[in-house]
Swiss-Prot record:
Summary of subunit composition and partner proteins: Interacts with protein M1. May interact with host nucleoporin RAB/HRB and exportin XPO1/CRM1.
Full protein name: Nuclear export protein
Upper lineage: Viruses, Riboviria, Orthornavirae, Negarnaviricota, Polyploviricotina
Keywords from the UniProt entry: Host nucleus, Host-virus interaction, Transport, Virion
GO cellular component: host cell nucleus; virion component
Other observations noted: Average number present in a viral particle is estimated to be 130-200 molecules.
Repeat among keywords: no
Protein's job: Mediates the nuclear export of encapsidated genomic RNAs (ribonucleoproteins, RNPs). Acts as an adapter between viral RNPs complexes and the nuclear export machinery of the cell. Possesses no intrinsic RNA-binding activity, but includes a C-terminal M1-binding domain. This domain is believed to allow recognition of RNPs bound to the protein M1.
Biological process per Gene Ontology, one example term: exit of virus from host cell nucleus through nuclear pore
Pfam families according to UniProt: Flu_NS2
Subcellular location: Virion; Host nucleus
InterPro entries in alphabetical order: Flu_NS2
Family: Belongs to the influenza viruses NEP family.
UniProt source species: Influenza A virus (strain A/USA:Iowa/1943 H1N1)
Positions occupied by motif Nuclear export signal: 12-21, 85-94
Length: 121
């Protein structure tokens, strides 16, 4: 796994956790939780690809891994839309930069998960 991606996740999560968005702080906490969940999923998929023979193990652990993969792509799409929405409504430059970087990271992670999943199929 790319160390820059790991530090990007950690940096964005830390900055998002410091943001105060008023009444929408619950939404932001939900986004942070989904980011963390997505990172863990991407990491586990990447580890399975590195072991390359691990498809059977992955299927045994979770017989519905393709369904789970589809759900993760839905989460990514939702997060992308949510981040885009936040980007449009915020006027704070710190928040704009954070959300732009979060959007870029989400797009990178989506591509990584696609690549990993194609290697596992």
């Amino acid at each position: 796994m790319d160390p820059n991606t790991v530090s990007s996740f950690q940096d964005i999560l830390m900055r998002m956790s410091k943001m105060q968005l008023g009444s929408s702080s619950e939404d932001l906490n939900g986004m942070i939780t989904q980011f963390e969940s997505l990172k863990l999923y991407r990491d586990s998929l990447g580890e399975a690809v590195m072991r390359m023979g691990d498809l059977h193990s992955l299927q045994n652990r979770n017989g519905k891994w393709r369904e789970q993969l589809g759900q993760k792509f839905e989460e990514i799409r939702w997060l992308i839309e949510e981040v885009r929405h936040r980007l449009k409504i915020t006027e704070n430059s710190f928040e704009q930069i954070t959300f732009m970087q979060a959007l870029q990271l989400l797009l990178e992670v989506e591509q990584e998960i696609r690549t990993f999943s194609f290697q596992l199929i």
